[in-house]
From Swiss-Prot:
GO MF annotations, alphabetized: DNA binding; DNA-directed RNA polymerase activity; protein dimerization activity
Superkingdom classification of source: Bacteria
Biological source species: Bacteroides fragilis (strain ATCC 25285 / DSM 2151 / CCUG 4856 / JCM 11019 / LMG 10263 / NCTC 9343 / Onslow / VPI 2553 / EN-2)
GO terms under cellular component: cytoplasm; DNA-directed RNA polymerase complex
Assembly description: Homodimer. The RNAP catalytic core consists of 2 alpha, 1 beta, 1 beta' and 1 omega subunit. When a sigma factor is associated with the core the holoenzyme is formed, which can initiate transcription.
Gene Ontology biological process terms in this record: DNA-templated transcription
Name of the protein this chain belongs to: DNA-directed RNA polymerase subunit alpha
Entry EC number(s): 2.7.7.6
Gene name, Swiss-Prot/TrEMBL: rpoA
SUPFAM superfamilies: C-terminal domain of RNA polymerase alpha subunit, Insert subdomain of RNA polymerase alpha subunit, RBP11-like subunits of RNA polymerase
Length: 330
């Protein structure tokens, strides 16, 4: 059954943007879609984007988080609270984790910027953050491990990174998003005034541009919603064999193979030859070998080259077994 056309924008307007703040406008939307889209994006942005954070520390002479460090004003608990606030940006793509040993001496303060001096794959975004204060003669030796993650992970789940009895796991705040606000306003389209405009404000820690953060959140939503878009999904099925129907690649291929050839940019001659042979979809076409196609009436090498180029552009090939995609299950 055909779906009635929705009033929707053809692009997202970026009203303001810098490294940490972005303001976006999305309009026009059907009534009710402003809060639907805005709330979903806000939740994903705050909870589900990847980032980098400290997962474990080891301080020389300290056995647990309730200890104190000689010559250091703050106890270990407060040091951990401050370390949780250090923000990192990946500067070398190959680095998804890094462990460094840091020595602080002849200094009255240990700042986040001191960590950055020892890092290879990451940049510290808030170098002026004070971790702790030291006596003039005190020396502090600390090992820090940085890992990639999503959202918020409590210390208990970071125990897997503890390789030594004196290593202390800490809570990790991976999310690069500091704040997300959205507002829904009325918007007029011709004579109708009940359409909506969604205004979205995103503040990051600087490790990701607000525009990229919005794109990543949208991708996560699309990935989850596409699982409901395939006609052949049986939502009540719990058997193992049914799991493949939820595989992203399988879903993509099933949708692609159902594409009508008349919707592709093919010559009239090639389309007529295929239609005469009851070949109507990409799924029908890829099951044939090239030699089989040349047996079709009025089908020549020029048409074969045209189809070969089409399939190659779609990462498809002739002689494909499509049985695993279960296109016959309507």
């Amino acid at each position: 059954m055909a779906i009635l056309a929705f009033q929707k924008p053809d692009k997202v307007l970026m009203l303001e943007a810098d490294a940490k703040f972005g303001k976006f406008e999305f309009r026009p939307l059907e009534p009710g879609f402003g809060i639907t889209v805005g709330n979903a994006l806000r939740r994903i942005l705050l909870s589900s984007l990847e980032g980098f954070a400290i997962t474990t520390i080891r301080i020389e002479g300290v056995e647990h988080e309730f200890s104190s460090v000689p010559g250091v004003k703050e106890d270990v608990t407060n040091i951990i609270l401050n370390l949780k606030q250090v923000r990192f940006k990946q500067v070398v793509e190959e680095f998804e984790s890094e462990k460094v040993s840091i020595t602080i001496e002849n200094s009255s303060e240990f700042k986040a910027g001191d960590i950055g001096k020892y890092l290879t794959g990451f940049e510290v975004l808030n170098p002026e953050l004070v971790i702790c204060h030291l006596d003039s003669k005190a020396t502090m030796q600390i090992d820090i491990t940085i890992n990639k993650g999503r959202g918020y992970v409590p210390a208990d789940e970071n125990r897997e990174y503890c390789t030594d009895v004196n290593v202390i796991p800490i809570d990790s705040i991976y999310t690069p998003i500091r704040n997300v606000k959205y507002a829904v306003e009325n918007f007029r389209v011709e004579q109708k005034t009940d359409y909506e405009k969604l205004v979205l404000e995103i503040t990051t820690d600087g490790s990701i541009h607000p525009k990229e953060a919005l794109k990543e959140a949208a991708k996560i939503l699309i990935y989850h919603f596409m699982l409901f878009s395939d006609e052949k999904i049986t939502l009540e099925s719990n058997d193992v064999d049914g799991n493949e129907e939820f595989d992203e690649e399988v879903l993509h291929m099933r949708q692609l193979l159902k594409t009508k050839l008349v919707d592709m940019d093919l010559s009239v001659r090639a389309l007529n030859c295929l239609k005469a042979a009851d070949v109507e979809t990409l799924g029908d076409l890829v099951q044939f070998n090239k030699t089989d196609l040349l047996k079709f009436r009025n089908f020549g090498k020029k048409s074969l080259t045209e189809l070969d180029d089409l399939l190659e552009s779609l990462n498809l090939s002739f002689g494909t077994d499509i049985s695993k995609y279960k296109l016959d299950k309507e």
